[in-house]
Amino acid sequence: MKSVFLEEMAVLLKKMDNYRIIYHIRPDGDCIGSAYALALSLKSIGKKCKVTGEYPVPDAHISMTSKVLSDDIDDPVNIAIDSGSPDRLGIFENEQYTFCIDHHLDNSVIADYKYIEEDAGACSEIILKLIKLMGVTVTKDIADLLYMALVTDTMCFRTYDTTQQSFLTAAELAGYGADIAGIGRRNMFIKSKRRIALEELLKKSFHFSVYTAAKTARARTFNRTCTDSEPQFST
């Protein structure tokens, strides 16, 4: 396993031909947008590419990813995208990875070549720099995917890890024709993973409380009914 500079990774990616890009379980916009943008970029320079993961692409992103057709590939080179640990890769956890690209400092995925940029607000910031180093022409479709990835991971630039580079990346993608307004509107009310988990916990607690209250009420009603129906004996 070797950590490499982004320039080195760009050179290495251009040397090989068949790629399988694997995103993490319970995929979010950043891993999906980054994976499909990289796939489009590799295909644009003559490479064969397939994007996959244990979970399907979320419905919210299908309209953007459906334009990226997968190639039939034998013996592909595996690329792990935006996955901080092997277990995040799900059923692909035990695959052999040649490349790993991520922005999580504690990344533990084993790969021949790794590039980790912990200061990046989203993996898409890294992908944009990488494909430019590869000499890829950034099309509107690529820009849309990367902008979607950026706004979902930064929650429309509201997270603490949103940086100056995040805004510069957004401006650059706008220059490439990204649908800033449309993608922004569709992702305006994104919730953080922590908030979603909290809401799920509260929902379960609420349902449990309602169930417990209903069960208690039924028990009290039953007890009253039994008491009222007991035979009365005169003395």
Regions found by a protein language model. Give the residues of each.
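Hydrophobic helix-and-loop "lid/oligomerization" segment in the mid-to-C-terminal part
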Residues: 2-60, 71-76, 152-235
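Glycine-rich, phosphate-binding/catalytic loops in enzymes
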Residues: 38-39, 95-98, 116-117, 168
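Short, motif-level signal for alpha-helix interfacial/capping segments enriched in acidic residues
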Residues: 3-10, 81-82, 131-133
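An acidic intrinsically disordered interaction segment
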Residues: 1-9, 87-95, 119-127
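Short alpha-helices
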Residues: 104-169
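Active-site cofactor/cluster-binding pocket
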Residues: 56, 62-113
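Hydrophobic/aromatic residues located in beta-strands of well-ordered beta-sheets
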Residues: 49-51, 98, 146
